[in-house]
Regions:
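Conserved "right-hand" nucleotidyltransferase catalytic core of DNA-directed polymerases
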Residues: 1-51, 55, 62-63, 126, ...
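Short, conserved charged micro-motifs
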Residues: 75, 644-651
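Glycine- and acidic
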Residues: 153-160, 209-217, 260-262, 401-412, ...
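Conserved catalytic core of nucleic-acid polymerases
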Residues: 206, 345, 349-350, 355-357, ...
Length: 680
């Protein structure tokens, strides 16, 4: 049965639903343990737009209640929303509109988030997580969403009321279906952790972060100057090299007023990769890479490709990389940040995706326009998008532009050597655990000791003091090996021969038997099971989505197959050769995932657990909207709070306690920095 609660009953009489008073609705809702919840709004930005209606449903009692919040105060339902167990779809969105009224639900189940958890690892676009798609996939039910885009301009009418009610009809059924899968896949603990984090990430977006506009304008001017200087240096590199005259032009014409200039002028547009490719080839660089999607060769001058060719023309690489860096800063972190400032809050509000990567890590930002904010500020919608704070330059000048409000402090708190410490625990690499627990904690020196025979009998303290050059070499080795890198990657980073790099890689695994065992076991497990267990405590898994295809292909590799392959493999366009290449590339990729995903996956579980505890402290102590969570970047938490509170101590304690729950062999300390701006 569909009910409508409204302050204007005379306008909404209809045989398709029944009118109900506020008191009657509260009585019915109070009798339920679980409530399905959704809301319709006047727009997508909770800090600008408002509620149009909210919907409650319950499967056992078979009702849906639509509350017209334009005539009935949502505050009348505060205790219901905060006390009952709420099931919803993409609740991060709905909660922000409730936060505007000081309503803070924390007992929530999000069908979208749990569905994403159950399909972690599937490529973007292969699975839809909309309510309609989930209902069709799990229940075989078609949910009509044709009115969704019309609600903003239609307002509340008969069709919108019935549409809204239908959105809270099937959520419990979806939840029960998902929980069966969670039980089977042993990830119910992970599902609860992710659902508990939904109110936190919603609060993170709702709080936003304050940007000092004057400081930012000064930074923008300096960035533009740096970009101009980088462009001039590249132009000079061309014009001063006679062998590159094809990329110059001499202006023969002039006049008596401006004079005559016979100096060569660079004709390359440094923002055009096509033009830079032509230059790079002439300078001797190999610009050919394989397109990941089409598997066809293409030209590239991306830094990650060119930096592997050091020694060909390092002067050009240094100049070009500097230009690319400044160009990215100017285009991505300039006026767009100022456009993000919400006039109503005076703060920048962005979008976070809770399960933004296959590892379970969050992602940040979106090129989707904020139409409500653009309209409010009177700027084109295309110029009003959401900033990616995870890619924000970490230099002091940039970070110092993000500040605390007057009377507040800004605290940045991050984990010390999170992935190294966590890796030591997960791999059960005893030499690393002992280094952290009883010695200097210098993992780079420990890696150097394992990889370079001349350091075999040296202590890590001696290596750091007397062999800094080898310790420096050990840094990229350790990083590469912990993340499943090949000997070729070591050779590229150190500039050594492949044979020498292979010896170093072998020495690394010999020196760290725990990592070697974990690597071998992980490779075997992922090939057999088709997933990587990223956190053994929560059951978070990364699924090899086309694992069955890989297994079927593996079975087809018979003796007859290999005999045919040997006669045709040199033909790179041959279907058999391509199939073999793809097969072993997939195996190599998942071997790497099996090694490095557990540290990344458990790392983000730790941060989510910590911030959930911190958010609960905020709410339990009446500090909602006084203590703000303003940014989460990888393993770093940033908060803002009144100067008379010691929230840095609370945050540090929450982070260290969370780490202790998931890292049993050694502590992971958190380090807090407090000031009037973003310090880290």
């Amino acid at each position: 049965m569909v009910y409508l609660v409204t302050g204007q009953p005379d306008l909404f009489e209809n045989p398709n639903y029944k009118l109900m008073s506020v008191e009657e609705s509260l009585q019915l809702l109070s009798s339920c343990k679980i409530l399905q919840y959704d809301s319709e709004t006047t727009g997508v930005d909770a800090r600008i737009c408002d509620l149009l209606c909210v919907q409650f449903g319950n499967k056992e009692k078979d009702f849906q209640i639509v509350v017209d919040t334009t005539t009935v105060s949502i505050l009348l339902y505060k205790s219901i929303l905060e006390d009952k167990y709420i099931v919803g779809q993409n609740l991060k969105f709905d909660l922000q509109f409730l936060y505007n009224y000081g309503i803070i639900p924390r007992k929530v189940y999000d069908t979208m988030i749990v569905e994403q958890l159950l399909y972690l690892g599937y490529p973007s676009g292969t699975i839809s997580y909309s309510l309609a798609s989930i209902a069709q996939r799990r229940l075989g039910i078609d949910i009509d969403k044709s009115i969704r885009g019309q609600i903003i301009w239609r307002g509340l009418d008969e069709q919108v009321i019935l549409y809204s009610a239908n959105d809270v009809r099937w959520l419990e059924d979806i939840m029960h279906s998902q929980l069966k899968d969670c039980e089977e896949k042993q990830c119910k603990v992970g599902a609860k952790l992710e659902c508990d984090f939904v109110p936190v990430i919603s609060y993170l977006e709702w709080c936003g972060i304050k940007l000092d506009e004057e400081k930012w304008l000064v930074k923008m001017k300096k960035d533009k100057e740096n970009l101009d200087k980088a462009r001039e240096s590249l132009d000079k590199f061309i014009t001063s090299n006679p062998n590159l005259s094809q990329f110059t032009h001499i202006e023969r014409q002039g006049d008596l007023f401006s004079g005559f200039n016979s100096d060569p002028i660079c004709t390359i547009n440094w923002s055009s990769s096509r033009q830079v490719v032509q230059l790079a080839k002439i300078l001797g660089f190999d610009t050919t890479v394989q397109d990941k999607k089409t598997k066809e060769d293409k030209d590239s001058v991306l830094e990650k490709h060119l930096k592997t060719q050091k020694g060909i023309n390092d002067e050009f690489l240094d100049l070009y990389f500097a230009y690319q860096e400044y160009a990215k800063v100017v285009s991505s972190f300039g006026q767009s940040q100022l456009n993000m400032i919400n006039p109503k809050t005076g703060r920048c509000h962005t979008i976070y995706k809770q399960l933004g990567a296959a590892s379970g890590r969050m992602s940040c930002g979106s090129q989707q326009p904020n139409h409500a904010l653009a309209k409010l500020k009177g700027i084109p919608a295309k110029d009003c998008t959401y900033c990616n704070f995870q890619q924000l330059p970490s230099d002091e000048v940039t970070r110092s532009c993000f500040v605390a409000e007057e009377g507040n402090l800004f605290c940045s708190c991050d984990y010390s050597a999170l992935e190294s410490r966590l890796g030591a625990d997960i791999y059960q690499e005893h030499s690393m655990i002992e280094e952290f627990l009883y010695k200097s904690g210098d993992i780079h020196s420990l890696v150097a000791k394992a990889c370079f025979p001349e350091l075999k009998d040296k202590t890590t303290e001696e290596i750091k003091k007397n062999y800094p050059h080898l310790r420096k070499k050990a840094k990229p080795i350790g990083f590469s090996q912990q993340f499943g890198g090949s000997a070729r990657a070591i050779a590229s980073s150190l500039g050594c021969s492949l044979e020498e790099a292979e010896d170093i890689a072998a020495a690394y695994l010999n020196g760290f038997p725990g990592i070697a065992k974990f690597k071998a076991d992980g490779s075997k497990a992922v090939r057999q099971k088709g997933y990587v267990l990223m956190c053994k405590y929560t059951g978070h898994k990364m699924y090899w989505w086309d694992h069955q295809v890989w297994l079927d292909r593996q079975k087809s590799f018979t003796q007859e197959f290999w005999e045919e392959y040997r006669t045709r493999h040199k033909d790179t366009g041959d279907a058999i050769a391509l199939s073999v290449r793809e097969h072993f590339q997939a195996a190599s990729k998942w071997d790497r995932m099996a090694l490095n995903s557990p540290t990344q996956g458990t790392g983000i579980v730790i941060l989510k657990s910590a911030m959930t505890d911190f958010f609960n402290y905020i709410v339990d102590n009446g500090l909602f909207n006084r203590v703000k969570i303003v940014a989460l970047v990888h393993d770093e938490a940033n908060i803002e709070y009144p100067i008379n509170l010691s929230m840095d101590v609370v945050l540090k304690e929450c982070m260290e306690k969370a780490a202790a729950k998931f890292c049993k062999s050694l502590p992971i300390p958190a380090e807090a920095a407090v000031g009037d701006h973003w310090i880290h």
